[in-house]
């Protein structure tokens, strides 16, 4: 008799995705981050749901409702910090996942890659709107500064910003709609994840060598389910340690001050996971130019498949490209550091240099190095 998991209409979908899925035998721990992101999304939706039961999206009570959650709700402090630090863990896994894709050439699966870029934008939008909800100083001023960037769009900019605000400044209408979208977007993200997996399972997974692995496949369960569970345990241990020992490590102290439109914080900055893009934005003196650079810093991922010039897919056997890749990682760390610094010498010039190098490496140096490596292969 055939196993029910192979015949039942619902179970056979799960079976073909997580049990009998043929997977390359050589997948390293860098392939764990997809499942870790799934766990992060689950944790965020669950903690967010319980937080939404106690949160009020009104400018008069939002800040106090968050205080009430932390002080009066049973384990409310745990929910709040799991949600806030869960977002940080989400982005750590996201950036490592994208980095893995760049290093091992996974971007050649263009449909999966493009849906992944959409997912990245959706998660960034969700995180930005979530940061506004506690209605602290950095929430308010971060929302004001970032939404104001849209006013750089020619002709319709000002009207667009006022339409998003629901008035002439960030106020009650803005907070209410941001809460509505912050609640809705994770479910759209979950739907996009399904599409992401659908496209991935059409082609099968890439592997560290970048060589087709059709002759050497193993079932996903038990090999990679066990490996993923180990990943879950490590990540949840790290998250628990962060939440229980230093929950405010990655937050901004200014957000413990209630939002005040009459008092601007000395340094307005977003959460740490947006600092690299914020540094690129600040590096360009022109407003519209800065906004374009900000969008392009993420959107540039969409043209990476077109810029792939190498005869080899993965960087595993391409030492010159590896050097450039790690230089790019160092530049992203530099940009993240610069984004958190005040706009003064020498930070301005460091930020501008790092921003130019970021785009140069992706657009020119990497394709040129790939062509050079192709030439060296003939020797």
Curated annotation (Swiss-Prot):
Coiled coil regions, renumbered to chain: none
GO-annotated cellular components: mitochondrial inner membrane; respiratory chain complex III
GO molecular function: metal ion binding; ubiquinol-cytochrome-c reductase activity
Location relative to the cell: Mitochondrion inner membrane
Cofactor dependency: heme b
PROSITE patterns given in the database record: CYTB_CTER (PS51003), CYTB_NTER (PS51002)
Alphabetical list of Gene3D superfamilies matching this protein: Cytochrome Bc1 Complex, Chain C
Purpose of the protein: Component of the ubiquinol-cytochrome c reductase complex (complex III or cytochrome b-c1 complex) that is part of the mitochondrial respiratory chain. The b-c1 complex mediates electron transfer from ubiquinol to cytochrome c. Contributes to the generation of a proton gradient across the mitochondrial membrane that is then used for ATP synthesis.
Official protein name in the record: Cytochrome b
Organism: Stenoderma rufum (Red fruit bat)
Lineage: Eukaryota, Metazoa, Chordata, Craniata, Vertebrata
């Amino acid at each position: 008799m055939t196993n029910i998991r192979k015949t039942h209409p619902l179970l056979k979908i799960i079976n073909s995705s997580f049990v009998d899925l043929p997977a390359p035998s050589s997948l390293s721990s860098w392939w764990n981050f997809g499942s870790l992101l799934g766990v992060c999304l689950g944790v965020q939706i669950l903690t967010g749901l319980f937080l939404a039961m106690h949160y009020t999206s009104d400018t008069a009570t939002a800040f106090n409702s968050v205080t009430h959650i932390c002080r009066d709700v049973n384990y409310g402090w745990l929910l709040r910090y799991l949600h806030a630090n869960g977002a940080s863990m989400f982005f750590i896994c996201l950036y490592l996942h994208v980095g893995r894709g760049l290093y091992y050439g996974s971007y050649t699966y263009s449909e999966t890659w493009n849906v992944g870029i959409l997912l990245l934008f959706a998660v960034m939008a969700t995180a930005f709107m979530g940061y506004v909800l506690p209605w602290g100083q950095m929430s308010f001023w971060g929302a004001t500064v970032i939404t104001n960037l849209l006013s750089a769009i020619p002709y319709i900019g000002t009207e667009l910003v006022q339409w998003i605000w629901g008035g002439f400044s960030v106020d009650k209408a803005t907070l209410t709609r941001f809460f509505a979208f912050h609640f809705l977007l994770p479910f759209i993200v979950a739907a996009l994840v399904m599409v992401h997996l659908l496209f991935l399972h059409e082609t099968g997974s890439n592997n560290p060598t970048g060589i087709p692995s059709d002759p050497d496949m193993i079932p996903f369960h038990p090999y990679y389910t066990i490996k993923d569970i180990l990943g879950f345990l490590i990540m949840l241990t790290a998250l628990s340690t962060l939440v229980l020992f230093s929950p405010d490590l990655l937050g901004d102290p200014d957000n413990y001050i209630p939002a005040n439109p009459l008092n601007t914080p000395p340094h307005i900055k977003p959460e740490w996971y947006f600092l690299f893009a914020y540094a690129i934005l600040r590096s360009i003196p022109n407003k519209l130019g800065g906004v374009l650079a900000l969008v392009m810093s993420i959107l540039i991922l969409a043209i990476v498949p077109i810029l792939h010039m190498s005869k080899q897919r993965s960087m595993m056997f391409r030492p010159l490209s590896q050097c450039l890749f790690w230089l790019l990682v160092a530049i992203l760390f530099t940009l993240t550091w610069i984004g958190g610094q005040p706009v003064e010498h020498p930070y301005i010039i460091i930020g501008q240099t790092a921003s130019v190098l970021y785009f140069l490496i992706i657009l020119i140096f990497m394709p040129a190095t790939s062509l050079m490596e192709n030439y060296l292969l003939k020797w």
